[in-house]
Amino acid sequence: LTAGLLLLGFQAAAQDIPQAFQGKWAGHYEGKVSPKHIRALCAMGYDENAAMDNVYVSEDSGFYIEIGKKSIELTGWEWGAKYTKLNYRIYSPDKIAGTARVREEEPEQGTQIYNDNFEFSLNRGVLTQRFRDFSTDGSGKKVWRTRTLMRCK
Protein backbone atom coordinates (compact mmCIF):
# COMPACT_ATOMS: atom_id res chain seq x y z
CA LEU A 1 0.00 0.00 0.00
CA THR A 2 2.79 2.44 0.88
CA ALA A 3 4.56 1.81 -2.44
CA GLY A 4 1.27 2.48 -4.28
CA LEU A 5 0.76 5.75 -2.43
CA LEU A 6 4.34 6.83 -3.13
CA LEU A 7 3.92 6.04 -6.82
CA LEU A 8 0.64 7.99 -6.92
CA GLY A 9 2.37 11.01 -5.35
CA PHE A 10 5.20 10.80 -7.88
CA GLN A 11 2.78 10.60 -10.81
CA ALA A 12 0.85 13.62 -9.57
CA ALA A 13 4.04 15.65 -9.25
CA ALA A 14 5.27 14.64 -12.70
CA GLN A 15 2.09 15.73 -14.52
CA ASP A 16 2.06 18.84 -16.68
CA ILE A 17 -0.27 21.66 -15.69
CA PRO A 18 -3.52 21.15 -17.66
CA GLN A 19 -3.48 22.93 -21.03
CA ALA A 20 -6.55 25.05 -20.18
CA PHE A 21 -4.52 26.84 -17.46
CA GLN A 22 -1.45 27.48 -19.59
CA GLY A 23 -0.83 30.99 -20.93
CA LYS A 24 -0.56 34.57 -19.71
CA TRP A 25 -3.25 35.96 -17.41
CA ALA A 26 -3.76 39.52 -16.11
CA GLY A 27 -5.65 41.11 -13.25
CA HIS A 28 -5.09 43.09 -10.05
CA TYR A 29 -3.21 41.93 -6.96
CA GLU A 30 -6.54 41.21 -5.29
CA GLY A 31 -10.15 41.31 -6.39
CA LYS A 32 -11.86 41.45 -9.76
CA VAL A 33 -11.33 43.49 -12.93
CA SER A 34 -13.39 44.27 -16.01
CA PRO A 35 -12.58 42.98 -19.52
CA LYS A 36 -11.65 46.59 -20.45
CA HIS A 37 -9.03 46.70 -17.69
CA ILE A 38 -7.73 43.27 -18.71
CA ARG A 39 -7.20 44.46 -22.29
CA ALA A 40 -5.31 47.48 -20.96
CA LEU A 41 -3.19 45.40 -18.58
CA CYS A 42 -2.37 42.89 -21.32
CA ALA A 43 -1.39 45.71 -23.68
CA MET A 44 0.75 47.23 -20.94
CA GLY A 45 2.48 43.95 -20.14
CA TYR A 46 5.31 44.40 -17.68
CA ASP A 47 6.09 47.91 -19.00
CA GLU A 48 4.59 50.42 -16.60
CA ASN A 49 5.35 53.24 -19.07
CA ALA A 50 3.27 51.76 -21.91
CA ALA A 51 0.51 53.99 -23.28
CA MET A 52 -2.99 53.13 -22.12
CA ASP A 53 -6.07 54.34 -24.02
CA ASN A 54 -9.03 55.62 -21.99
CA VAL A 55 -8.31 53.38 -19.00
CA TYR A 56 -6.74 54.39 -15.71
CA VAL A 57 -4.47 51.59 -14.56
CA SER A 58 -1.53 52.58 -12.39
CA GLU A 59 1.75 50.74 -12.60
CA ASP A 60 1.26 49.09 -9.22
CA SER A 61 -2.19 47.71 -9.96
CA GLY A 62 -1.28 45.23 -12.68
CA PHE A 63 -0.72 41.62 -11.74
CA TYR A 64 0.29 38.86 -14.14
CA ILE A 65 0.42 35.10 -13.94
CA GLU A 66 2.18 33.10 -16.63
CA ILE A 67 1.44 29.39 -16.47
CA GLY A 68 3.62 26.93 -18.35
CA LYS A 69 3.71 23.14 -18.47
CA LYS A 70 5.68 22.74 -15.22
CA SER A 71 5.74 26.15 -13.51
CA ILE A 72 3.66 29.16 -12.51
CA GLU A 73 5.20 32.63 -12.55
CA LEU A 74 3.54 35.56 -10.75
CA THR A 75 4.62 39.14 -11.43
CA GLY A 76 3.44 42.35 -9.76
CA TRP A 77 4.91 45.80 -9.27
CA GLU A 78 8.43 45.29 -7.83
CA TRP A 79 7.60 41.70 -6.89
CA GLY A 80 7.71 38.28 -8.47
CA ALA A 81 7.49 34.61 -7.58
CA LYS A 82 7.99 31.38 -9.47
CA TYR A 83 6.28 28.14 -8.40
CA THR A 84 8.08 24.94 -9.42
CA LYS A 85 8.14 21.30 -8.29
CA LEU A 86 4.35 21.19 -8.13
CA ASN A 87 2.76 18.37 -6.12
CA TYR A 88 -0.96 18.14 -6.74
CA ARG A 89 -3.61 17.50 -4.11
CA ILE A 90 -6.34 18.28 -6.68
CA TYR A 91 -5.74 17.80 -10.41
CA SER A 92 -8.66 18.25 -12.82
CA PRO A 93 -9.33 20.16 -16.06
CA ASP A 94 -10.81 23.08 -14.10
CA LYS A 95 -8.97 23.02 -10.74
CA ILE A 96 -5.42 22.44 -9.55
CA ALA A 97 -4.22 22.68 -5.97
CA GLY A 98 -1.29 21.42 -3.96
CA THR A 99 2.16 22.46 -2.82
CA ALA A 100 5.12 23.92 -4.68
CA ARG A 101 8.63 25.26 -4.25
CA VAL A 102 8.48 29.06 -4.41
CA ARG A 103 11.27 31.47 -5.30
CA GLU A 104 10.12 34.97 -4.38
CA GLU A 105 11.95 38.15 -5.42
CA GLU A 106 11.21 41.44 -3.67
CA PRO A 107 13.45 44.56 -3.43
CA GLU A 108 13.04 45.01 0.34
CA GLN A 109 13.23 41.31 1.23
CA GLY A 110 15.65 40.01 -1.42
CA THR A 111 15.22 36.43 -2.60
CA GLN A 112 13.29 33.98 -0.45
CA ILE A 113 12.83 30.27 -1.21
CA TYR A 114 10.16 28.27 0.59
CA ASN A 115 7.38 25.70 0.13
CA ASP A 116 3.82 26.98 -0.15
CA ASN A 117 0.31 25.94 -1.13
CA PHE A 118 -1.26 26.90 -4.45
CA GLU A 119 -4.84 26.78 -5.69
CA PHE A 120 -6.20 27.80 -9.11
CA SER A 121 -9.61 27.20 -10.68
CA LEU A 122 -11.16 28.01 -14.05
CA ASN A 123 -14.76 29.01 -14.68
CA ARG A 124 -15.94 30.39 -18.04
CA GLY A 125 -12.52 31.66 -19.02
CA VAL A 126 -11.80 33.35 -15.68
CA LEU A 127 -8.84 32.16 -13.61
CA THR A 128 -9.30 32.40 -9.84
CA GLN A 129 -6.41 32.07 -7.43
CA ARG A 130 -6.90 31.53 -3.70
CA PHE A 131 -3.82 32.48 -1.70
CA ARG A 132 -2.69 33.21 1.83
CA ASP A 133 -1.38 36.67 2.61
CA PHE A 134 -0.79 38.78 5.68
CA SER A 135 -3.85 40.52 7.11
CA THR A 136 -4.12 44.27 6.61
CA ASP A 137 -5.16 44.76 10.26
CA GLY A 138 -1.55 44.73 11.48
CA SER A 139 -1.99 41.48 13.42
CA GLY A 140 0.60 39.60 11.38
CA LYS A 141 -1.89 36.78 10.80
CA LYS A 142 -2.29 35.18 7.40
CA VAL A 143 -5.74 35.22 5.81
CA TRP A 144 -7.21 33.74 2.62
CA ARG A 145 -7.54 36.15 -0.30
CA THR A 146 -8.82 35.72 -3.84
CA ARG A 147 -7.77 37.26 -7.12
CA THR A 148 -9.42 36.81 -10.50
CA LEU A 149 -7.59 37.10 -13.79
CA MET A 150 -8.47 36.88 -17.45
CA ARG A 151 -6.36 35.48 -20.26
CA CYS A 152 -4.29 37.86 -22.38
CA LYS A 153 -4.98 37.29 -26.07
Regions from the language model: what does each represent?
Residues 9-11:
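N-terminal signal peptide c-region/cleavage motif recognized by signal peptidases
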Residues 16-71, 106-115:
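Short, solvent-exposed loop/hinge segments that bridge or flank secondary-structure elements
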Residues 56-104:
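Predominantly extracellular/secreted and cell-surface proteins with exposed
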Residues 58-61, 80-86, 109-117, 141-146:
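Short, surface-exposed coil-to-beta transition loops
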Residues 83, 87-90, 124-153:
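Edge beta-strand at a domain terminus
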Residues 91-124:
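Acidic, glycine-rich flexible loop segments
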